[in-house]
């Protein structure tokens, strides 16, 4: 539909609304639907015509008109509510005198109506409602996209999610499934004796991750504050305080780029368990993913973007170092040592900075050559200490940490490790991060003196993990982009377009 035609229809609908206003308030607020379309269909669709006629089932529903076929003295209307669609059959003789011609025929597709009637089946066997009363509840001023073309423009779907949800059943199901997944996650951790907590979203020091933060200003306190990039340091303060198992479903903010995997505002589940190791959390993570699969699909097997995953099987597990060698058969261990790793990275087009150590260079090689090849669920372990400022060093090799990341479908889904609870060691690592920030690394962490003070009281041996819920939902809804699983993803401003 052209903009000119669309504007013409809007003008026509506004004229109808003006006439309705003259007769009273057209936005009725006293209709109480007693039924949902899908419930009616599930309960009565198998009934015969004769059985329905004998039962004389009275129903009332409310929803949006999605289709309207006027055939003289009778009409068929499809009404859509939150559960689905059902057909209404409306005849002139069943309604008050003159109502059919003077009011019903003036209703438009997109209008929200309330209707009451009796169930019956049409000549072709479609369960329908024979309407005895229908009321306009809300007048739609903008026409919906054409039925057979729908809302096909991807950017418009993201910008006008409200229209996408009206027109696209797949989108509605995606967000219902997202809610189901988050509910399952909460129940999972509650059932494993974790306590759900809430920590500050406005922080004086952004910490818990290597990322750029959003800065704001607190007027009353006259001080800069930051939207959190992660809740980690606050959650570990709670471990110090004796809350041995905590989790938070958190909104995090990172002032970084947009992509099919990244949105500046995103949701995570972070959880921390005292007297546990990163191996314990790897086992717990497998159990969580298996449970989500069964809850969503009734099976451990799911399909995502051309790949099949069986969550009943143990996840693969390999170290950062070994994975680089496995996926780069032309390289040897010698290629990844202090003398040669920089040359390998530069051959790959990586711009190696002067302050990068061997660990950082190895991770850059890993991200460039391995990450996207990790299709089946895989734990990557033994991350270099240099890129893991909050993780516990490995007892046998201080160059690496007791850390893992989980990759599925070529992207990181989770990050966990045994926590560093040595206050002096953590202070030294913070100082190193400050040096890197002073050397123009915008993502390096700041020194958090209060967190060090908390560690000085003593934090028990602890393991913690963060799982990206948006990416998790992408996986379990077979969605190719993070924008498909965010109701209102961030977009460039329409102003000036």
From Swiss-Prot:
Q: What is this protein called?
A: Lysine--tRNA ligase
Q: Which gene encodes it?
A: lysS
| Keywords carried by this UniProt record | Aminoacyl-tRNA synthetase, ATP-binding, Cytoplasm, Ligase, Magnesium, Metal-binding, Nucleotide-binding, Protein biosynthesis
The UniProt catalytic activity note for this protein reads:
tRNA(Lys) + L-lysine + ATP = L-lysyl-tRNA(Lys) + AMP + diphosphate
The EC number of this protein is 6.1.1.6
Please name the SUPFAM superfamilies in this protein's record.
Answer: Class II aaRS and biotin synthetases, Nucleic acid-binding proteins
Which cysteines pair up through disulfides? They are none
Q: Organism source for this protein?
A: Ruthia magnifica subsp. Calyptogena magnifica
Please, one GO biological process term?
A: lysyl-tRNA aminoacylation
Tell me the residue numbers annotated for binding Mg(2+) 1.
405, 412
């Amino acid at each position: 539909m052209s903009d000119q035609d669309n504007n013409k229809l809007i003008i026509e609908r506004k004229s109808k609304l003006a006439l309705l206003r003259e007769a009273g308030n057209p936005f009725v607020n006293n209709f109480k639907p007693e039924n949902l379309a899908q419930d009616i269909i599930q309960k009565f669709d198998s009934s015969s015509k004769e059985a329905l006629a004998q039962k004389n089932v009275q129903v009332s529903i409310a929803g949006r008109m999605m289709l309207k076929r006027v055939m003289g003295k009778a009409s068929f209307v499809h009404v859509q509510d939150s559960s689905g669609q059902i057909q209404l059959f409306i005849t002139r003789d069943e309604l008050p005198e003159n109502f059919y011609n003077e009011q019903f025929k003036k209703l438009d597709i997109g209008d929200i109506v309330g209707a009451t009637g009796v169930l019956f089946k049409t000549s072709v066997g479609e369960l329908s409602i024979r309407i005895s009363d229908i009321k306009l509840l809300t007048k739609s001023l903008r026409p919906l996209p054409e039925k057979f073309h729908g809302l096909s423009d991807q950017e418009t779907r993201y910008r006008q999610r409200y229209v996408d949800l009206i027109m696209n059943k797949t989108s509605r199901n995606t967000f219902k499934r997202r809610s189901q997944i988050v509910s399952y996650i909460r129940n999972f951790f509650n059932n494993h004796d974790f306590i759900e907590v809430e920590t500050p979203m406005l922080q004086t020091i952004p910490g818990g991750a290597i990322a750029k933060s959003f800065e704001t200003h607190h007027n009353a306190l006259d001080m800069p504050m930051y939207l959190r990039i992660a809740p980690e340091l606050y959650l570990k303060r709670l471990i110090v305080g004796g809350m041995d198992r905590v989790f938070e479903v958190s909104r995090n903010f990172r002032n970084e780029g947009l992509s099919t995997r990244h949105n500046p505002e995103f949701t995570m589940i972070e959880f921390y368990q005292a007297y546990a190791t990163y191996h314990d959390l790897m086992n717990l993570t497998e159990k969580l993913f298996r449970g989500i699969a069964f809850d969503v699909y009734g099976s451990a097997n799911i399909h995502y973007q051309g790949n099949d995953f069986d969550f009943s099987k143990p996840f693969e597990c390999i170290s950062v170092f070994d994975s680089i060698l496995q996926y780069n058969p032309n390289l040897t261990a010698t290629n990844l040592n202090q003398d040669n790793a920089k040359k390998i990275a530069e051959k790959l087009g990586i711009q190696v900075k002067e302050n990068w150590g061997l660990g950082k260079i190895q991770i850059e090689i890993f991200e460039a050559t391995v990450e996207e090849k990790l299709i089946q669920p895989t734990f990557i372990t033994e991350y270099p200490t240099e890129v893991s400022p909050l993780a516990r060093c490995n007892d046998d090799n201080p160059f690496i940490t007791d850390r893992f990341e989980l990759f599925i479908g070529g992207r990181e889904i989770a990050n966990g490790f045994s926590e560093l609870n040595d206050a002096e060691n953590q202070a030294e690592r913070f100082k190193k991060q400050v040096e890197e920030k002073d050397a123009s690394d915008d993502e390096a962490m700041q020194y958090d003196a209060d967190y060090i003070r908390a560690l000085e009281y003593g934090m028990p041996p602890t393991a913690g993990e963060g799982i990206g819920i948006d990416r998790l939902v992408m996986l379990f809804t077979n969605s190719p982009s993070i924008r498909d699983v965010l109701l209102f993803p961030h977009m460039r401003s329409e102003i000036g377009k």
